[in-house]
Amino acid sequence: MSKEVSEEGRHGKDYVDPPPAPLLDMAELKLWSFYRAIIAEFIATLLFLYVTVATVIGHKNQTGPCGGVGLLGIAWAFGGMIFVLVYCTAGISGGHINPAVTFGLFLARKVSLPRAVAYMVAQCLGAICGVGLVKAFMMTPYKRLGGGANTVADGYSTGTALGAEIIGTFVLVYTVFSATDPKRSARDSHVPVLAPLPIGFAVFMVHLATIPITGTGINPARSFGAAVIYNNEKAWDDHWIFWVGPFVGALAAAAYHQYILRAAAIKALASFRSNPTN
């Protein structure tokens, strides 16, 4: 690995790693772009929850054996909306739409602490509003069919559900890091759709695997918004899983990408050795 670092230094790079975000960047609180990004995260999460939870309720409301979109259609709704919304908001807020993604990027020093906290609050509020619209438009089936809330399915243990959420979120956040890696972005800059596409597809694939277990959280805002509006005891009993699992998965993905794939620790050591006066 150290050989790779030394060779990279000799031959130069065709990309530039952005500097790490400061932990407390209070200056950005004075910028309109900061608040514009928060609004973008709020609206994007609202739209995400409205479309996806409405799809879930609409499917469950069908009575025929061939009615509704099925598990595959639900997975496409979640993955497709992430693809669309990341494409629309990436240039404004980064297109997080998920506190676990924001947490992972914060750990990797991609965003500051104030921005991370503001994003998470906006995402949770947007999720509540999005599910609130679903309840307002589909009141009767919403109450009868579970409100799109995440719960542990019958036959699965809490540990299994937690593990599924950790692995599912790891897949998502790892894909986010890989799709937005500076090296990849520089070499694929002529195809701007490449970052949102694998992220949306990762969400789609994880839903296929995890819907039978937990309904698929991998997004604490999605789970929180549905739990708040549905306000059912079972949803709240299981709710901690949909925060702990995604945050642990995001932590693991950030560590794997930054310290194993990108060898951040080795590069920092090499930089220190080449500049001993720093």
Curated annotation (Swiss-Prot):
Entry's Gene Ontology molecular function annotations: water channel activity
Cytoplasmic side: 1-36, 96-116, 180-192, 262-278
Residue stretches spanning the membrane: 37-57, 75-95, 117-137, 159-179, 193-213, 241-261
CC terms in the record's Gene Ontology section: plasma membrane
Gene3D superfamilies documented for this protein: Glycerol uptake facilitator protein
Family assignment from sequence similarity: Belongs to the MIP/aquaporin (TC 1.A.8) family. PIP (TC 1.A.8.11) subfamily.
Protein's UniProt name: Probable aquaporin PIP2-8
Native organism taxonomy: Eukaryota, Viridiplantae, Streptophyta, Embryophyta, Tracheophyta
Gene it is expressed from: PIP2-8
